[in-house]
């Protein structure tokens, strides 16, 4: 069946996401995937450098000491922290935890996730550096 009426197509500007703060933050959060790809490629490069022996590893360490690579890695770290923060804030919304017939607020869950993250990071750093 066809109609003679012209369908209404709402115009969408290319900068639609810049209108509201929520959308800008959403795009920033989704943009954290780009530094994550960088870090994944960097890890793969490190594994292959480690596989190729001491000379390859020295080259990889030299690459990591490049100021541009250091800057990109700092940006990647900040993006990972932002992504982690937003996921930890979403976690309590996904699970209803009831204690003594009352729904638990999100704060204890978020704090527990951060504590686990900090403890795991401390253990990994201790094992790696000692």
Curated annotation (Swiss-Prot):
Signal peptide: none
Entries under NCBIfam families matching the protein: PRK04987.1
Organism: Yersinia enterocolitica serotype O:8 / biotype 1B (strain NCTC 13174 / 8081)
HAMAP family, alphabetized: Fumarate_red_C
Transmembrane portions of the chain: 37-57, 60-80, 109-129
GO terms for MF: succinate dehydrogenase activity
Subunit structure: Part of an enzyme complex containing four subunits: a flavoprotein (FrdA), an iron-sulfur protein (FrdB), and two hydrophobic anchor proteins (FrdC and FrdD).
Protein name per the record: Fumarate reductase subunit C
Subcellular location field: Cell inner membrane
One cellular component (GO) term of this entry: plasma membrane
Keyword annotations from UniProtKB, A to Z: Cell inner membrane, Cell membrane, Membrane, Transmembrane, Transmembrane helix
Stated family: Belongs to the FrdC family.
Main localisation: membrane
Membrane topology, from the record: Multi-pass membrane protein
General function of this protein: Two distinct, membrane-bound, FAD-containing enzymes are responsible for the catalysis of fumarate and succinate interconversion; fumarate reductase is used in anaerobic growth, and succinate dehydrogenase is used in aerobic growth. Anchors the catalytic components of the fumarate reductase complex to the cell inner membrane, binds quinones.
């Amino acid at each position: 069946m066809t109609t003679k009426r012209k369908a209404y197509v709402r115009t969408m500007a290319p900068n639609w996401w810049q209108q509201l703060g929520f959308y800008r933050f959403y795009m920033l959060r989704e943009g954290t995937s780009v530094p994550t790809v960088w870090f994944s490629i960097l890890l793969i490069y490190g594994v292959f450098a480690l596989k190729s022996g001491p000379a390859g590893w020295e080259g990889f360490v030299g690459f990591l000491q490049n100021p541009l690579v250091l800057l990109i890695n700092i940006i990647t770290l900040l993006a990972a922290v932002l992504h982690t923060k937003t996921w930890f804030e979403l976690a309590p919304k996904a699970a209803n935890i009831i204690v003594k017939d009352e729904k638990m607020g999100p704060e204890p869950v978020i704090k527990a996730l951060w504590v686990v993250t900090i403890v795991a990071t401390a253990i990994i750093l201790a094992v790696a550096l000692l």
